[in-house]
Amino acid sequence: MKSCEIGQQGESAAALFLYNKGMSILERNWRKGRFEIDLVCQDIKTLVFVEVRTRKAKGMLLPEQTLTISKRCNIIHSAQLYLMDKKDWSMPCRFDVICIISKKTTLELEHYKNVFEFYEIMDSSNTSWQPW
């Protein structure tokens, strides 16, 4: 199976997993320019931006080890663009990561909630990420 097919399989499994946990799936693979969010969900009154990391079982790195600082910054920036695009700043937000290991016939899935914050990409002045 090709890398992109494994990624798509992982994203589909993650969306189904979150749906079965009671979340609403609002967007899949939302894009703005070069920025992308794998899944945008709503968990009761919280907007959840989900990064899905899928790897083959025989890979050298675990999925969670591939989430670099640069990638986190891109995810946070993507979320800011999403909120600006939708013009809806009313809900609290969080960032989740779903790590999936693709084995021959099964997927092993781990869900990590609230793994990083908007302020991680801010400078030391802690300027608000909201537009006002």
Curated annotation (Swiss-Prot):
<dbReference type="Pfam" id="PF02021">
    <property type="entry name" value="UPF0102"/>
</dbReference>
<comment type="similarity">
    <text>Belongs to the UPF0102 family.</text>
</comment>
<dbReference type="GO" id="GO:0003676">
    <property type="term" value="F:nucleic acid binding"/>
</dbReference>
<protein>
    <recommendedName>
        <fullName>UPF0102 protein LI0223</fullName>
    </recommendedName>
</protein>
<dbReference type="InterPro" id="IPR003509">
    <property type="entry name" value="UPF0102_YraN-like"/>
</dbReference>
<dbReference type="InterPro" id="IPR011856">
    <property type="entry name" value="tRNA_endonuc-like_dom_sf"/>
</dbReference>
<dbReference type="InterPro" id="IPR011335">
    <property type="entry name" value="Restrct_endonuc-II-like"/>
</dbReference>
